[in-house]
């Protein structure tokens, strides 16, 4: 009789462990193919947030993502640059702002492990890596960015 209860308990623990691992994924118009390949490797039960920056609202498309992941498209053409500057949004700026704001709110307590995959351009990715590692003290081992950017230690 205990076996049935233990089995259910073990299943519940495994289910809870899968649900607790979140993903934070970023991309831009140049990395959409990489994003689609990455999303195809995730299990259907994956959860988390995907931020995609594109030049204009007309560039927004459909991404095949797991059902528990939220996709947010960020059109630079409809956003401003630095507050009060009157400038237009530079490449990577909207992506960095949205990702850092989400991370500040959702990754502040470290209760849920979040795997970070940054596929966007260098400028936005550099700002995000800096914010995650210095402000939020996220371990570099949980962050994946293109090696060509040289933003993370090679021995992580």
Question: Predicted regions span which residues?
Answer:
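Extended, composition-driven regions rather than compact fold-specific motifs
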Residues: 1-156
């Amino acid at each position: 009789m205990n076996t049935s209860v233990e089995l259910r308990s073990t299943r519940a623990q495994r289910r809870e462990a899968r649900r607790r691992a979140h993903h934070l994924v970023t991309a831009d118009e140049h990395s959409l193919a990489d994003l689609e390949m990455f999303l195809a490797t995730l299990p259907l039960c994956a959860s988390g947030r995907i931020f995609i920056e594109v030049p204009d609202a007309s560039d927004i498309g459909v991404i095949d993502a797991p059902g528990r992941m939220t996709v947010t498209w960020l059109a630079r053409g409809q956003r401003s640059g630095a507050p009060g500057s009157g400038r237009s949004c530079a490449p990577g700026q909207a992506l960095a702002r949205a990702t850092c704001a989400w991370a500040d709110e959702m990754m502040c307590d470290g209760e849920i492990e979040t795997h970070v995959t940054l596929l966007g351009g260098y400028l936005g990715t550099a700002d995000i890596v800096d914010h995650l590692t210095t402000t939020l003290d996220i371990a570099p081992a949980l962050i994946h960015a293109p090696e060509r950017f040289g933003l993370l230690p090679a021995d992580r």
